[in-house]
């Protein structure tokens, strides 16, 4: 987010050259993952997040609520396989993530979901809205707020998890993930 902010501030004309953005960040109407109210990406630089979302550049926002719809359990992670090196590496990363903390029960696909939606927008339904990010240093610092007006941000609402996991499995040639 910070890099986009810097680009737009230093080169304002660049905004007119961008058709749209797909961003992963924020926690609209859901619990944050850094604080009760804030998601990590927006918490790190809420001023940049708020600025980017207010430019008028069309944004598809994949927030935590969306990402929490595409989770993989520890059991599934240990039961899948791939014959490709890239697929094996992806599985290894997920399994190792679970190994860092025995209380972890679900791996959520944050950036992979944003990438998948940028490739195939039909993976989700959307709410067109205006969004702001709290920038004042209060307990709500970094919180993402949607106004549900006809705005330039398409907030992901419902994700087709089956379609996402089919895409994920096909892309990485993963076996044992799909029924």
What is each stretch, according to the model?
Residues 1-69, 74:
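Active-site histidine-anchored catalytic micro-motif
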Residues 40-47, 62-179:
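Conformational coupling and interaction surfaces
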